[in-house]
Structures are given as C-alpha cells and as structure tokens.
Amino acid sequence: MSHLNGSEPSRAQRETEGRWEEKNVLCDQIKEIIAALNDIRTQLAEQNKYLDVLTETYVRKPAPTHLVFAQELETGGWEEGSDWGEYADFAQGEILPAPGLEYEGSCEQNYEGKYKGDYEENYEENYEENYGEENYEEVKGRYREEEKESPKVDSFHVNETAASRNQREPILAESKGDMQKQKCYSLESTGPSFYLPLGLVISAHVSQASFTTVFIILSLAAYIFATFTLWFLREEDWVKRIIGSWRLAKANASASANSNANAITDSIQADQDRGSRIPDLLRRRQVLETS
C-alpha cells in the first residue's frame, strides 16, 4: 500500500506482484486449453451425429421378409454355388420347349412318355453290368416307390422362377440326398438399398461407444493437467525449495568430487617431487664418500 500513498513499492512487493502476474497468465492459458478441449468435444459430437445420419441412410437393414421356397428341380447338372441366372436358364432349357415349339401334353406326360423309357433302359444296363440280373425286380419296385414320393416338375413354377431371377438373390442352396435334388432359398427385395463396404462405416452404437471412450480419455487428461498445474501454482515456494535442495545437493556432490580430485592430484605431485629429490641425495652421498 506504500505505492498508493505516493512512495515507491519495495522490492518484495514488486516480486509478489510479478509472481501473481505469472500465475494469472498461467491460469489464462489453462482456461484457453480447457476451452479448446470443449470445442473439440463439441466437434466430435457433431461428427457422431453426422455418422448416425449416414448409418441410418446408407447402411439400413432391409425389412424382414419371408423365405421363398423354390421347387426342387431334378436337373442333374446344377452344382451348389453356381450362378442363379445360369441355373434358371438351364432349368428352363431342359424342361420348357424352345421358342416357337410346344410339347404335346404336359411336362408330366412328356416325362412319362419320353424320358422314362430312356432312364429305365440306362438303369437296367448299369444294373446288369454292376450287379447282374438277380434281384432286379426288387430293386425296380423300390425305385418305383421312391419315384412316387419324389416331387414332379412344375412348368409354371419354372416360368415364374426364370422371369423373376433378376429380382431375387439366392442366399442358400443346400443339397438333400444327392446333387441332383437342390433346394434354393431366395429373398425378395422390398425396396432399393445401398450398402457400403463391410467395415468402412461402423454402426451407430459402436461409433457412440468409441466417441465416448475418446471423450473420457480427453476429459481425464485435461483434469490431470489442470490439477497438476494448479497444485504447482499454489505450492510454488515449496516446489522451488525442493528443486533448490536438489540443485544444492548436486552442487555439493560436484564440489566434494572436485576436492577429492584435487587432493589426489596434490598427493601424486608430492610423490613425484619426493622421488625427484632422491637422485640428488644419492649424488651428494657419493661425492662425500669419494672426498
């Protein structure tokens, strides 16, 4: 208060004022850092909302649909994993007539009249070559029973399958019994959908969890930094004393090391001087003995 009355402030007062000014500057810097971290947090929150909008717009799941069962087709040439279009074309070419031609009767009648005899003839030849003629009638009767239980080919369903192959996406094709009988399941699309590559955009729930983790880490780092800085400002004198004691201990250690080095150097020099005087004494003794 002396400078308010017109007198010059003392040195201690000037040092105190300078110290408080430094503290105020550090506090302002800490406030600016915290404000910058808050800005980063708000920006990340806005980006999170934007990612949520992208997820809902482009990575939405299709509406739940029922599985469409395609009739089993005894094609014999379609293997699991082949293209659906090729499969439908193959089935259509095998069962339906070529353009401009018509079968007489239904597919079932053509099967009974045309393909059945050829198949039975080939079956008899293969059976006779492999197993002989015995028990052929028993095997033939068993084959008849299995043939009655197997489903017939439906030409209308084949037409429907071939016409709608561009709107269907096969998701499962499993074999039952042998490779000649295939079950094909497909999903009918309910609307246009656009899917991003897998792993490029994560779901909203996972993205929120990751941003929450980032927020927690940033908040903890800012809290620890601010706490340490405020503690340093409050306990400045104590910290300075600790640092001064460290420096004093280091100076004492260096001084003691220097003194020890000087003592060793002095002792070595004394030994050298003592050794240099010995030849002079011997020379004097020889002179005295000869005289």
Curated annotation (Swiss-Prot):
Induction (free text): Down-regulated when grown with elevated levels of potassium chloride.
Transmembrane segments: 213-233
Annotated signal sequence range: none
Coiled-coil positions: none
Any Gene Ontology biological process: cellular response to osmotic stress
UniProt-annotated location(s): Membrane
Keywords on record: Membrane, Stress response, Transmembrane, Transmembrane helix
An annotated GO cellular component: membrane
Membrane protein topology class: Single-pass membrane protein
Record function comment: Involved in osmoadaptation.
Protein name: Uncharacterized protein AN2204
